[in-house]
């Protein structure tokens, strides 16, 4: 019992005092940063850029979005040998996951083998601009692919299998900000960038007109951008959910152990009460000292429990069923089993203790006397019965009834305190029914005894 209390207290201490606070800024920011930049090359993304940028410690970073932008510069020769160069002052593309490379090569508008208008590169069977063959392996070329219909990973894989040095994926709709492409194969030696829809359409139209376009993918600015609001909300939601679940589990655990403790306490109390009643019944069982050879039978010359012969100095207890045992042998047996080891006679029932559904609800009544008692003893018992017809019912408290009225207190059946709410399975109405039944039984016994007394008096006269 005390061990159970100690374990419960230890659980409470570990839950409230042993766990680190979930709302500390350092712990929260570190957790979110670790979740957000998983599988990234930290040494590359967080090293000082050009000696002018540096990042604080991990504990100062919240949720971050690592970005690498790229410049797209291209040129082509128009009709009349006029060179046209397109250069932008700001980055117009963004690298996806994987290697960040600077590449210059011939731009090829990817088409499907069976459909020259399909430029999604969602199949490994691809060709060049308007169905032209793919450049040879020794030539450096860059693929132009439209976004959609399949994942970025599939598009990059298909053009990489055709020995492309880079791939430009342009959006299929207008967007304000370029997102980061999720690519599984981060070790491929290919520069994969995503650009805006208008730039991709201009490049595809230029290629479809038959111009040879040379394009360069040049690394631009890079760094991290905090997106703390979304991640803080997520962490707060997860933390609150975890705390609520822990509180619910803790309340249920406390309630469970309280109920279990009350049940065990009531069970121990009932066991002690039953043991006390059993000891009272044992005190009523007669004993004798020794058993001489002239009075012992062949079948009862030894104790059935210890299998040892009776000696003149032994204390022998005689049960109501006339079976005899050593006092030191039968008393522990009766306290535990409350029955005769040989014939299973219920000793408590014989001496007037009846169970009413549980060990706590016990009815004590005056049993019928044995047939072999003398007439004088029967007369005395009848007189005692006339003087007192008391019932002691321990449900939920001990009370005394005399002819249906409460007359006063009697020695309680159990010396220990009875709880306010009984754990018995019987209701008070059922207990009253038992009292009424036993009262009727005793009235019948009293009537029979009165008739016997009258007959005995007539015989004596």
UniProtKB/Swiss-Prot annotation:
Its main location: membrane. Keywords: Developmental protein, DNA-binding, Endosome, Membrane, Metal-binding, Signal, Transcription, Transcription regulation, Transferase, Transmembrane, Transmembrane helix, Ubl conjugation pathway, Zinc, Zinc-finger. Residues 26-234 are extracellular. Residues 256-461 are cytoplasmic. The chain crosses the membrane at residues 235-255. Pathway: Protein modification; protein ubiquitination. This is E3 ubiquitin-protein ligase goliath. The gene is gol.
């Amino acid at each position: 019992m005390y061990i159970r209390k100690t374990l419960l207290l230890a659980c409470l201490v570990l839950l409230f005092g042993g766990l680190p606070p979930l709302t500390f800024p350092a712990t929260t920011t570190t957790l979110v940063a670790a979740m957000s930049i998983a599988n990234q090359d930290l040494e590359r993304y967080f090293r000082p850029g050009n000696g002018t940028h540096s990042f604080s410690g991990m504990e100062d970073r919240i949720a971050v979005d690592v970005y690498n932008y790229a410049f797209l510069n291209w040129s082509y020769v128009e009709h009349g040998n006029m060179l046209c160069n397109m250069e932008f002052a700001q980055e117009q593309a963004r690298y996806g996951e994987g290697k960040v490379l600077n590449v210059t090569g011939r731009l090829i508008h990817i088409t499907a083998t069976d459909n020259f208008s399909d430029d999604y590169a969602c199949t490994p069977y691809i060709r060049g601009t308007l169905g032209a063959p793919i450049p040879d392996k020794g030539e450096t070329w860059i693929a132009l692919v439209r976004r959609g219909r399949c994942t970025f990973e599939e598009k990059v894989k298909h053009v990489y299998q055709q020995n492309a040095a880079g791939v430009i994926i342009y959006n299929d709709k207008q967007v304000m900000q370029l997102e980061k492409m999720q690519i599984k194969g981060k070790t491929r030696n290919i520069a994969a960038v995503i650009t805006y829809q208008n730039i991709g359409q201009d490049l595809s139209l230029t290629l479809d007109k038959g111009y040879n376009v040379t394009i360069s993918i040049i690394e631009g600015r890079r760094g991290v951008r905090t997106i703390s609001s979304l991640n803080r909300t997520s962490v707060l939601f997860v933390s609150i959910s975890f705390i609520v679940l822990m509180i619910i589990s803790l309340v249920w655990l406390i309630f469970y152990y309280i109920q279990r403790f009350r049940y065990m306490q009531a069970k121990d109390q009932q066991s002690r009460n039953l043991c006390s009643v059993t000891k009272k019944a044992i005190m009523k069982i007669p004993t004798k000292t020794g058993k001489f050879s002239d009075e012992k039978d062949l079948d009862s010359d030894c104790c059935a429990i210890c299998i040892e012969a009776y000696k003149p100095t032994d204390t022998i207890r005689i049960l109501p069923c006339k079976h005899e045992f050593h006092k030191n042998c039968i008393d522990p047996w009766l306290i535990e089993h409350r029955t005769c080891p040989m014939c299973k006679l219920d000793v408590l029932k014989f001496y007037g203790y009846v169970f009413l559904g549980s060990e706590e609800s016990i009815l004590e009544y005056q049993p019928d006397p044995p047939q072999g008692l003398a007439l004088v003893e029967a007369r005395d018992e009848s007189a005692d019965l006339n003087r007192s017809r008391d019932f002691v019912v321990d449900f939920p408290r001990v009370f005394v009834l005399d002819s249906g009225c409460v007359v006063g207190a009697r020695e309680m059946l159990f010396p220990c305190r009875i709880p306010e709410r009984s754990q018995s399975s019987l209701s008070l109405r059922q207990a009253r029914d038992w009292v009424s039944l036993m009262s009727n039984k005793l009235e019948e016994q009293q009537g029979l005894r009165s008739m016997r007394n009258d007959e005995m008096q007539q015989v004596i006269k």
